[in-house]
Amino acid sequence: MPSTTRVLIRPEHVTDYVDIAALHARAFGNRTTEPLIVALHRSRRAFDPELSLVAEIDGRLVGHVLFSPHQIRLLGSTVPAVNLAPIAVEPAYQGQGIGGQLINEGHMIAASKGYLVSFLLGHPTYYPRFGYQTHAYGSSHLLLPLEEPSQEPLEVRSPAEEDVPALCELWQHEEQGVDMALFPGRDLLDWLSPHPAIQARVYLHSGTLVGYTRIHQNQPTHPRFFLARDAETARAMVSTIAKKLKTQAQDLLFTLPFHPLSASAQALGKATCQSWEAAMACELGPSPLPDYLAQVRAEQHPIGRPLWPTLFDLDE
């Protein structure tokens, strides 16, 4: 059995990129999704190579974990956080505590940099031993039937560099009250999907940007990401999308990822939430997380939900 007595945990180097990609492929049954997600993370402005850690034994790379910096919303505050994803250990070395060493070291480094929360989607019997609490967030949706197509559909096009400030303002307006909401970022690539079947679009009214969506071509009535200036705009966006479909309007029911605390939700209908056991969070420093979780568990506050960054569109 391989020995773990000489495990070295260190930040990645550029020369590790090929080995890290191959490691994730082997650990995930030759899937290429995880290597691609790691590579895309490195193109983010917030990427920190000191939070991309490798485990080495006798000069051989046997493990890797990535903690990606984000800004999340919790109880009305913006909290510096990290997302643990992905993590991989060489199959021959699994079950020997290497993953735990990577996680613990990542927690210490992230905390030293001022990050207060770590969150992830993972196995609910493994991660709690490192301080993660299950059912920390989940998903939400609002069902919106298409009542009558708008006579004047909105202008629709791909996002451009000059749209990013308006997109950030739109996100702030729509999502600032939603717990666990993730700020997408201030670069164009934060708003463009790397998945060839998922299109990012902006919506304009009289030249003003009023909406944004990311939609999979096979799920046109189930946007993955939906931001609107207000409820009227949301209806106009749905109508504009519907005009491009061949289905009869009366048969269309849109599932929008609104949360009960989304700015536009109340005027559109009832948004419902579902918690996930695999959705976990861990406090790295003093933060609103314990109060948020206590309120959620006492049913005094709706459970939060993130709309995931574009690079996770690859994880289909």
Would you name each region that the model predicts?
Residues 107-122, 247-258:
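Conserved GNAT acetyl-CoA-binding A-motif
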Residues 59, 89, 97:
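Conserved G/P- and acidic residue-centered "switch" motifs that form tight phosphate/ATP-binding loops
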Residues 134-227, 231-232:
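Amide-forming acyltransferase catalytic core, primarily the GNAT-like/NAT-type
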Residues 85-94, 223-234:
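A short, internal acetyl-CoA/4′-phosphopantetheine-binding micro-motif in the GNAT/acyltransferase core
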Residues 92-105, 115, 232-241:
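Conserved acetyl-CoA pyrophosphate-binding loop and the N-cap/start of the following alpha-helix
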Residues 50-54, 64, 86, 198-202, ...:
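Short hydrophobic/aromatic beta-strand element in the GNAT-like acyltransferase core
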